[in-house]
Each structure stands twice: as structure tokens, then as C-alpha cells.
């Protein structure tokens, strides 16, 4: 009897902990039966490429949410850094200069949000709402509300390869996404800073009493979010060969959705970056499946909202349930 109870406990625990992965497998299986073209190699690579931008932003969002924060400015950081990248490429500045400069700017912009939260004692929602609006306004001023094209030089072609190129038959954005997740997984799992992030999200007061500088951790996670938003901005701009002043609008919602669907708690202290990858894939596969089934984008918004709702309810009622 005791053995059966233990077995049931382990099965239940597995189903709860792996619910996002199980949901992804079920989604793929159902849509593959409805439309055999869904599981073709070309379509899978296309989904992964389309998902890469949201997935990369969602990694930064995971860091922030793990400390019970939120970053609403990611889309605005993407837009501004993308515009800066496009203008630098258009005057034929070398790519090896453009990339680090843009990533540094993104890191600094994210760090500013972190400083406002840490030093100004402002709630992350309010702080990043301010920076989101401010940076969007700066982007509009910088671009004069018009797209900035990268031009037609060899330099522009090289830059475009970031978003459209292939390495070993796999799109470059997928490689970038894979590297980002691998590095993030290592940081959160095997480094002191990763342990501090989980500790801060679990209990800020106790973390501070243990001698950990919580303000530095807060600035760090927002800087990471800014860095990855800028990286996503490079991919989007290079793919389109232009920077749109409205780029990144509502990207913060997709990123939050990926994190929540992936099982990271909005209360902080609990979650995995690989869960975020699964969450981003669920969103990406769902969007692609609905497109293949020729379902209106209006219904796609409803479907995405329902998926997020189910994920939040699962976190509230399953993730915390004692089995």
C-alpha cells in the first residue's frame, strides 16, 4: 500500500513539474494529425526561427520574474537599439563595432531600470512602465517616426545574415537562441549569482540579512534583460533590413506569456529557464498551427490568452499543491 502511494506521488509530481513539456507534446501531436505539413522539417525550422526573438527576450524576462519583478520595457529597448543598429549600418560602420555598441546600450538601458527599482525603491511594474514609455518616445524622436533602412552595401548584407543567414543548414537566429539558453541555464544552475537570484525571489529580507547585496542582483537581472532585448533587436532589424519605430510593441506580453507558460512563478523564486524555452515553443507552435489551420488572428489572440490563463491557474492550484 505504501509503495503504491509513493509511486502515485512520484507520477503526480512528474506530471506537475513537466506539465509544460507534456502540453507541448500534446499540441504537436494533435496539430500533426490535423495537418501533416505541420511536422515537416522546413516548418519546424520556420517555427523555431520565428520563436527565437520572443524566446531570447523571455530569457531576460525569466531572470527578472525570478526575483518577483517584471520588465515592461523590453519592446521599447528592442525598438531603440534596433534603430541605432540600422543607422550605424546605414553609414557603413563595421559590424564588429555595431554589435557590441548596440548590446552595450541595451545593457545600460536595462541597468537604468534596475537602478530605479533597486535604489529608487520603485515597484518594477511602475519603473519599467516609465522606461517603456520614455524609450518609445526617444525611439520616435530618433527615427522621426519613420523606418530606418540599413542600405544596400556589403556591410548591410553581412548584417542581414544575422537574421536571415544559415549555419550548417540551421538559421542563425536558432543558433543564437540556443547559445543564450545554454548560457542562461548555466548561470542560474551552477553559479553563485544564479543561487542569489533564486534566494532573492524566494525571500528578499532573508537574502539581505545573509549578507547578499540584493541591489546589485536587481540591477544585474534588469541589465541582462536589456542586453537580451538589444540582441533580439539586432535579429529583428537584420531580418527586415530596416528598423521600424513601432517594433517590439506588445513583445513584453509574449515574453511574459512564455515565462508563465513555462512554469516560472510570478511570485518569484521558482522556475527554470528551460521551462521558458518550452513556453516560448508552445506560443510559437500554437501561432503557427492556427495559421496553418487558417484561423483568424483575432481568434489567435483569444487562444493565446486562454493558454496564459490555464498556465497561471496551473501555477496557483497545481504547482503549490501538496501531493
Swiss-Prot record:
<keyword id="KW-0762">Sugar transport</keyword>
<keyword id="KW-0472">Membrane</keyword>
<dbReference type="Pfam" id="PF02653">
    <property type="entry name" value="BPD_transp_2"/>
</dbReference>
<feature type="transmembrane region" description="Helical">
    <location>
        <begin position="21"/>
        <end position="41"/>
    </location>
</feature>
<feature type="transmembrane region" description="Helical">
    <location>
        <begin position="95"/>
        <end position="115"/>
    </location>
</feature>
<keyword id="KW-0812">Transmembrane</keyword>
<keyword id="KW-1003">Cell membrane</keyword>
<protein>
    <recommendedName>
        <fullName>Ribose import permease protein RbsC</fullName>
    </recommendedName>
</protein>
<comment type="function">
    <text>Part of the ABC transporter complex RbsABC involved in ribose import. Probably responsible for the translocation of the substrate across the membrane.</text>
</comment>
<feature type="transmembrane region" description="Helical">
    <location>
        <begin position="217"/>
        <end position="237"/>
    </location>
</feature>
<dbReference type="InterPro" id="IPR001851">
    <property type="entry name" value="ABC_transp_permease"/>
</dbReference>
<keyword id="KW-0813">Transport</keyword>
<keyword id="KW-1133">Transmembrane helix</keyword>
<keyword id="KW-0997">Cell inner membrane</keyword>
<comment type="similarity">
    <text>Belongs to the binding-protein-dependent transport system permease family. AraH/RbsC subfamily.</text>
</comment>
<feature type="transmembrane region" description="Helical">
    <location>
        <begin position="55"/>
        <end position="75"/>
    </location>
</feature>
<comment type="subunit">
    <text>The complex is composed of an ATP-binding protein (RbsA), two transmembrane proteins (RbsC) and a solute-binding protein (RbsB).</text>
</comment>
<feature type="transmembrane region" description="Helical">
    <location>
        <begin position="167"/>
        <end position="187"/>
    </location>
</feature>
<feature type="transmembrane region" description="Helical">
    <location>
        <begin position="273"/>
        <end position="293"/>
    </location>
</feature>
<dbReference type="GO" id="GO:0022857">
    <property type="term" value="F:transmembrane transporter activity"/>
</dbReference>
<feature type="transmembrane region" description="Helical">
    <location>
        <begin position="122"/>
        <end position="142"/>
    </location>
</feature>
<dbReference type="GO" id="GO:0005886">
    <property type="term" value="C:plasma membrane"/>
</dbReference>
Amino acid at each position: 500500500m505504501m509503495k503504491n502511494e509513493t509511486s502515485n506521488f512520484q507520477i503526480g509530481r512528474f506530471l506537475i513539474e513537466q506539465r509544460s513539456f507534456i502540453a507541448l507534446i500534446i499540441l504537436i501531436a494533435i496539430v500533426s494529425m490535423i495537418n501533416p505539413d505541420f511536422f515537416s522539417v522546413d516548418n519546424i525550422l520556420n517555427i523555431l526561427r520565428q520563436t527565437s526573438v520572443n524566446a531570447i527576450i523571455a530569457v531576460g524576462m525569466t531572470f527578472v520574474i525570478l526575483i518577483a519583478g517584471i520588465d515592461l520595457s523590453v519592446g521599447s529597448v528592442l525598438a531603440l537599439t534596433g534603430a541605432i543598429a540600422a543607422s550605424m549600418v546605414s553609414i557603413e560602420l563595421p559590424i564588429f563595432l555595431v554589435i557590441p555598441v548596440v548590446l552595450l546600450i541595451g545593457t545600460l538601458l536595462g541597468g537604468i531600470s534596475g537602478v530605479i527599482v533597486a535604489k529608487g525603491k520603485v515597484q518594477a511594474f511602475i519603473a519599467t512602465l516609465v522606461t517603456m514609455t520614455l524609450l518609445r518616445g526617444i525611439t520616435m524622436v530618433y527615427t522621426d517616426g519613420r523606418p530606418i533602412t540599413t542600405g544596400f552595401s556589403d556591410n548591410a548584407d553581412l548584417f542581414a545574415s544575422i537574421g536571415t543567414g544559415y549555419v550548417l543548414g540551421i538559421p542563425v537566429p536558432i543558433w543564437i537562441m540556443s547559445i543564450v539558453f545554454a548560457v542562461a541555464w548555466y548561470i542560474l544552475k551552477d553559479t553563485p549569482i544564479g543561487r542569489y537570484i533564486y534566494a532573492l525571489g524566494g525571500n528578499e529580507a532573508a537574502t539581505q540579512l545573509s549578507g547578499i547585496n540584493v541591489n546589485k542582483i536587481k540591477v544585474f537581472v534588469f541589465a541582462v534583460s536589456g542586453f537580451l532585448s538589444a540582441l533580439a533587436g539586432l535579429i529583428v532589424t537584420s531580418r527586415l533590413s530596416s528598423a521600424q519605430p513601432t517594433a517590439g510593441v506588445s513583445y513584453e506580453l509574449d515574453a511574459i506569456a512564455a515565462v508563465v507558460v513555462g512554469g516560472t512563478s510570478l511570485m518569484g523564486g521558482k522556475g527554470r529557464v528551460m521551462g521558458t524555452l518550452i513556453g516560448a515553443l508552445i506560443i510559437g507552435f500554437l501561432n503557427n498551427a492556427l495559421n496553418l489551420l487558417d484561423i483568424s488572428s483575432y481568434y489567435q489572440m483569444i487562444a493565446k490568452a486562454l493558454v496564459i490563463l490555464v498556465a497561471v491557474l496551473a501555477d496557483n492550484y497545481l504547482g503549490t499543491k501538496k501531493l
